[in-house]
């Protein structure tokens, strides 16, 4: 027998080290992981056998068996699924084979208490065996191949792979050599209870050997949970199915179990998690809804079954209208699949709209977890933009709570027809921004956008129900025109730029190319100045993001808006009228301050510091 000794990838070594030294209390999840893997192996072979029946010749009844050998301190899990050859064993058990495991590693903090919690939250498949075993032996024979291979490791950095001449039928057998301190898992009654807890939803029959090791007892009904009537399924069964499917420790927030019997027949059992998934925004993240055709698993990869902005969904979709022998390539642009996708999207958005109205506090928690992903749909070429906007909520600057666009519109001031927003990284900083002080002083609400995606979707969706959605950084905002014409108006704020031409020209001459235009502001009430952009220009935060991503080279010159009611600006204006033009340093300082408040870089930090020091010195001397 030829035996090869190999080292684990460094990443796998880290996971194994965590498993071996784990203090995680719910170690029984190793059975969930191994049973799920065995079920997947059977599903894969069932799918492949549709086009090649020889793969299951003589053994077409899939099953999983679990056996306890107390004398040898072993738990043995056996399946007759797809099996693995030598290369499969090395790739699947010796290296990082899935992005989820790599993402798990990135989430490790170094704090053993926190890291042990991650085990239960994310699931790490086969490697969880080493929480209870000090040695694991895997024997496997791949369907359609004759060779048998054995993989073995103690989890301490190395593993061996060898050929074997033992008699072994198709599939995989995993033998866990249980640690002395984990004796409870050798208790027949306890292990049977654990297996039954995790297996009831599994579509493959699972058999448990009695204590004598002779008779097999079937533990599960071996019928897919989603095929059963809802009236026969308990809440606990739904929860356990969700946890097994998604490797989660939380309970689902929403469960959607529906049978569609219209033009397209399909069943969906979908869940929205109650906790944020660690890899929600990872570029390699797979959508985790599995496609079945007539109870046969087809794929959960490279199929457009749900839109990417609903990638937080977990569950299964089982279609009656797709042929079992369909190729995965044919699924890429399939009209039936597209109709299923549209129906699911409509159903999910409908559930979210209902929750938003009935349980606003719960919905706020959902939004904090998944709102950023959901808003990505507003950037896509889809007919669902308005339905998506209906379920979006945003922070209200006026009321300091999350509100919908419909709530915002319902609270319009008399004469108002525009939805105003301000985008930035921190809601507290946005609340103190000069950009919105005039609007808030007139009780005109402003929505605070703090997700990066917000700056993108507003470029695609400039209106909602015929109301313009406008950034508060735009130059043409006139607070007085926005509110009721019956309100008393401050004549200073409505003076034309012509009346202050001496002032605006002086600022422009002093600042030169640093600014595009200098205007009198119709939205400032107390601050001396602010940056602004025209309606046709790119939003300030969006431009900054694209510069950071090296999509554009340089920032464009912005407009500078002045507040003639501010004492500093008033002094400069009065000096100019007295032919005193010695305020260049103060003008530059006002511009630098406007840049800082907007998150823009100061052109010359050294000069800014000197100006500030000079003004402070004049004030105290």
From Swiss-Prot:
Keywords: ATP-binding, Chaperone, Cytoplasm, Nucleotide-binding, Stress response. SMART domains: HATPase_c. Residues 329-544 are annotated as: B. Residues 486-496 have a biased composition (Basic and acidic residues). GO terms for molecular function: ATP binding; ATP hydrolysis activity; ATP-dependent protein folding chaperone; unfolded protein binding. Its main location: cytoplasm. InterPro entries: HATPase_C_sf, Heat_shock_protein_90_CS, HSP90_C, Hsp90_fam, Hsp90_N, Ribosomal_Su5_D2-typ_SF. Residues 545-621 are annotated as: C. It comes from the Bacteria. PROSITE patterns: HSP90 (PS00298). GO terms for cellular component: cytoplasm. Residues 1-328 are annotated as: A. Transmembrane segments: none annotated. The keyword Oxidoreductase does not apply. Residues 475-496 are annotated as: Disordered. It is found in: Cytoplasm. Belongs to the heat shock protein 90 family. Homodimer. Molecular chaperone. Has ATPase activity. This is Chaperone protein HtpG. The gene is htpG.
């Amino acid at each position: 027998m030829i035996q090869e000794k190999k080292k684990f990838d460094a990443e796998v070594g880290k996971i194994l080290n965590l498993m071996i030294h784990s203090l995680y209390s719910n170690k029984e999840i190793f059975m969930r992981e191994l049973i799920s893997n065995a079920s997947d192996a059977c599903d894969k072979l069932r799918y492949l056998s549709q086009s090649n029946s020889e793969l299951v010749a003589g053994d077409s009844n899939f099953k999983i068996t679990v056996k306890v050998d107390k004398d040898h301190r072993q738990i043995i899990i056996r399946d007759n699924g797809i099996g693995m050859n030598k290369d499969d064993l090395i790739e699947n058990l010796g290296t990082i084979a899935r992005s989820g495991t790599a993402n798990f590693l990135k989430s490790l903090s170094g704090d053993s208490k926190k890291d042990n919690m991650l085990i239960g939250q994310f699931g790490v498949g086969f490697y969880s065996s080493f929480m209870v075993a000090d040695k694991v032996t895997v024997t496997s024979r791949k369907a359609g191949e004759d060779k048998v291979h054995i993989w073995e490791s103690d989890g301490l950095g190395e593993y061996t792979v060898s050929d074997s001449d033992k008699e072994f039928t198709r599939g995989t057998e995993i033998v866990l050599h249980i640690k002395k301190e984990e004796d409870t898992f050798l208790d027949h009654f306890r292990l049977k209870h654990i297996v039954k807890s995790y297996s009831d939803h599994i579509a493959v029959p699972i058999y448990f050997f009695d204590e004598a090791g002779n008779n097999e007892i079937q533990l599960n009904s071996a019928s897919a949970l989603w095929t059963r009537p809802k009236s026969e399924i308990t809440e606990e069964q739904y929860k356990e199915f969700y946890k097994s499917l998604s490797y989660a420790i939380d309970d689902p927030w929403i469960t959607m179990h529906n049978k569609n019997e219209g033009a397209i027949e399909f069943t969906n059992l979908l869940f929205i998690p109650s906790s944020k998934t660690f890899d929600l925004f990872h570029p390699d993240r797979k959508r985790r809804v599995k496609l079945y055709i007539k109870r046969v698993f087809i794929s959960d990869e490279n199929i457009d079954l749900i839109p990417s902005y609903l990638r937080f969904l977990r569950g299964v979709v089982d279609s009656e209208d797709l042929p079992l022998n369909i190729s995965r390539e044919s699924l890429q642009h399939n009209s039936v699949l597209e109709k299923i996708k549209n129906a699911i999207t409509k159903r999910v958005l409908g559930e979210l709209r209902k929750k938003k109205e009935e349980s606003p506090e719960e919905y706020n928690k959902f939004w904090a977890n998944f709102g950023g992903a959901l808003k990505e749909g507003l950037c896509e070429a889809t007919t669902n933009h308005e339905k998506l906007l209906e379920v979006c909520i945003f922070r209200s600057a006026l009321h300091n709570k999350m509100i919908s666009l419909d709530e915002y519109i319902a609270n319009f001031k008399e004469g108002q027809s525009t939805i105003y927003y301000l985008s930035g990284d921190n809601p507290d900083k946005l609340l103190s921004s000069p950009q919105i002080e005039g609007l808030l002083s007139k009780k005109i609400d402003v929505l605070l956008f703090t997700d990066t995606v917000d700056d993108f979707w507003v470029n695609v969706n400039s209106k909602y129900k015929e109301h313009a959605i406008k950034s508060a950084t735009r130059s043409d905002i006139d607070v007085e025109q926005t509110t009721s014409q019956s309100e008393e108006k401050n004549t200073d704020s409505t003076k034309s730029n012509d009346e202050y031409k001496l002032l605006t020209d002086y600022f422009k001459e002093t600042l030169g190319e640093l600014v595009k235009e200098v205007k009198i502001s119709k939205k400032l009430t107390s601050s001396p100045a602010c940056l602004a952009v025209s309606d046709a220009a790119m939003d300030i935060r969006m431009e900054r993001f694209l510069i950071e991503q090296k999509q554009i080279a340089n920032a464009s010159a912005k407009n500078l808006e002045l507040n003639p009611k501010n004492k500093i600006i008033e002094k400069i204006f009065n000096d100019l009228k007295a032919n005193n033009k010695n305020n260049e340093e103060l003008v530059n300082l006002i511009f630098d301050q406007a840049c800082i408040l907007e998150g823009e870089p100061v052109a010359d930090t050294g000069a800014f510091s000197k100006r500030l020091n000079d003004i402070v010195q004049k004030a105290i001397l």
